[in-house]
């Protein structure tokens, strides 16, 4: 069955029988008899919605949403995950802190409350996606053909991803599956219970190979499912109270083994880091054309004509490029420039002294020098707000140059199609658009290599030399010098994860797992505690979890709030 157009456009959501808004927690499965399962395209339509529920905010274009009470773009799935994962961390700030009634500024400063609108949007977005997946699974429960079994496995992985985000962000979770009776209400389940459910689901799918090792483009396959399981085990001590380093490392080894032979130094990694985040990164996706470098193990497809969303890469690109006097937005394939996201001092300092590292090649240096925190990076004050921010570019709407051998990293824009004019000015060869066709990575192979190393450092499992080799593989691809054995430390690992994975929605989780976000070992970062405080203050322990939104507690009086709220 060809799902391509359904994965891109999302199919006909009304065929699922879903309500148009989940703001009232109306998430129980609908009566399957209300769904027209006689439509020959029903399964493709329905599975397409399971995918597009992560990509878009609603079924009627970029301005529609099935989450009420919040701007559709702001409440888009991947955008809410990004916002809650990156803004409270030691990487980013949003320079318009009063946006969304101050909710964004509170996230940056780690001073949010249970009435925060972004937190509300994330909770309901996750539950809405879980409901969509449940609906598909309920309506295909009796089908036993091989194609449907695989489609069901994909929907289960996508649902597991939403439940993973739920326990990562909120701890306890509203919980319901496709086996619930019609009219049955979701109940509140503990973090441990949902952790066990996710583990059971993913282990069955991976170990029984219910999902393809060679999926079609845009669909989740064996690598994506096992990578999500590895990430679950990586954070097991936080989620379940019991570390699972050996289990995480074993899953990493499986994935690494399947990718040996091609790409950078035969590792399966893409040869060029920044190619992973531009418009034709589709070749690195599951089912992508570059089989030797399929580094993106789990990703979400976007298309500027068929998947228009102010979440995902469109949000990241538009928010990170800034005023045209600093970075002409056309140079990055985007017709919008929001001048919103900047890197804070701690993020900038991680690249200090690494002059050959390619991962910051699109960053902008040498402007607004009144807040220059180092010899390399420059902050923004005055008209930019008290942010200490740095212009950090990673995702673009550009396409890869046709001649990779000609890439000149001293002129970052030559990474992409174009040519120098008679005056020596680089002229990009593309039209800037509002919406990006860049796909969004969820888990990459580079993360798997770093997970293996962390399992050794934190759990003492595996070999020291192998752990060192794997982190140095990531550094070699970036152009940074190798660590020696004595440098295999938690601090260096965390800095390397930030350099490699910034803007990929993992930093808050990394900090919590390594006891650096709250508690006695936390580091004090800029802006924390007060959006106008450049020095920052310590973060209260309660902020290791987000609160259950007030709207949920009002509609479900038996639900309990997280401690401290």
Predicted regions span which residues?
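Long, intrinsically disordered, low-complexity segments
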Residues: 20-22, 27, 40, 126-127, ...
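Membrane-proximal, proline-rich intrinsically disordered regions
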Residues: 21-78, 552-565
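Conserved, well-structured interaction surfaces
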Residues: 40-48, 52-58, 92-170, 185-193, ...
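Flexible, polar/acidic helix-loop-strand segments at domain edges
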Residues: 97-113, 121, 346-444
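Structural register within alpha-helical repeat arrays
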Residues: 159, 229, 236, 445, ...
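Short coil/turn linking the two alpha-helices of tandem helical-hairpin repeats
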Residues: 167-169, 174, 235-241, 458-461
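Extended ligand-binding clefts on enzyme/binding-domain cores
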Residues: 263-400
């Amino acid at each position: 069955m060809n799902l391509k157009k359904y994965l891109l456009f999302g199919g006909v959501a009304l065929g699922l029988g879903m309500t148009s808004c989940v703001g009232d927690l109306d998430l129980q499965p609908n009566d399957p008899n209300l769904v027209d399962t006689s439509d020959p395209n029903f399964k493709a339509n329905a599975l397409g919605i399971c995918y597009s529920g992560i990509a878009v905010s609603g079924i009627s274009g970029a301005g529609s949403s099935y989450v009420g009470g919040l701007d559709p773009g702001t409440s888009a799935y991947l955008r809410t995950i990004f916002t809650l994962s990156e803004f409270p961390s030691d990487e980013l700030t949003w320079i318009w802190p009063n946006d969304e009634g101050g909710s964004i500024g509170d996230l940056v400063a780690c001073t949010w409350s249970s009435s925060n609108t972004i937190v509300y949007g994330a909770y309901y977005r996750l539950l809405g996606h879980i409901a969509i997946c449940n609906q598909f699974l309920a309506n295909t429960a009796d089908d036993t053909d091989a194609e449907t079994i695989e489609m069901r496995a994909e929907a289960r992985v996508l649902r597991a991803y939403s439940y993973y985000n739920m326990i990562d962000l909120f701890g306890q979770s509203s919980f319901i599956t496709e086996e619930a009776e019609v009219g049955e209400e979701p109940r509140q389940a503990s973090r441990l219970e949902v952790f066990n459910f996710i583990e059971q689901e993913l282990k069955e799918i991976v170990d029984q190979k219910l999902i393809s090792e060679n999926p079609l483009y845009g669909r989740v396959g064996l690598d994506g499912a096992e990578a999500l399981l590895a990430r679950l085990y990586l954070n097991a001590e936080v989620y379940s109270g019991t570390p699972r380093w050996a289990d995480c490392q074993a899953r990493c080894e499986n994935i690494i083994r399947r990718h040996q032979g091609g790409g950078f130094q035969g590792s399966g990694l893409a040869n060029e880091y920044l190619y992973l985040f531009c418009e034709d990164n589709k070749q690195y996706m599951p089912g992508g054309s570059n089989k030797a470098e399929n580094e993106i193990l789990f990703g979400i497809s976007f298309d500027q004509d068929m998947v228009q969303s102010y979440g995902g890469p469109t949000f990241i690109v538009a928010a990170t490029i800034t005023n045209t006097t600093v970075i002409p937005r056309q140079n990055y394939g985007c017709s919008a420039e929001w001048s919103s996201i900047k890197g804070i001092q701690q993020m900038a300092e991680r690249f200090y002294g690494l002059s050959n590292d390619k991962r910051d090649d699109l960053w902008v240096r040498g402007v607004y020098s009144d807040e220059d925190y180092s010899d390399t990076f420059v902050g923004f004050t005055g008209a930019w707000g008290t942010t200490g921010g740095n212009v950090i570019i990673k995702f673009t709407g550009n396409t890869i140059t046709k001649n990779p051998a000609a890439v000149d990293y001293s002129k970052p824009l030559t990474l992409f199609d174009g040519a120098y004019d008679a005056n020596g000015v680089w002229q990009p060869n593309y039209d800037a658009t509002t919406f990006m066709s860049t796909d969004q990575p969820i888990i990459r192979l580079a993360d798997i290599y770093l997970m293996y190393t962390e399992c050794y450092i934190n759990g003492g499992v595996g070999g020291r030399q192998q752990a060192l080799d794997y982190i140095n593989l990531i550094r070699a691809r970036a152009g940074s010098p190798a660590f020696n054995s004595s440098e295999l430390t938690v601090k260096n690992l965390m800095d390397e994860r930030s350099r490699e994975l910034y803007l990929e929605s993992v930093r808050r989780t990394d900090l919590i797992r390594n006891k650096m976000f709250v508690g006695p070992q936390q580091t004090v970062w800029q802006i924390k505690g007060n959006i106008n405080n450049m020095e920052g203050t310590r973060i209260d322990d309660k902020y290791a979890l987000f609160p259950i939104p007030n709207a949920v507690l009002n509609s479900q009086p038996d639900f309990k709030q997280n401690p401290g709220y």
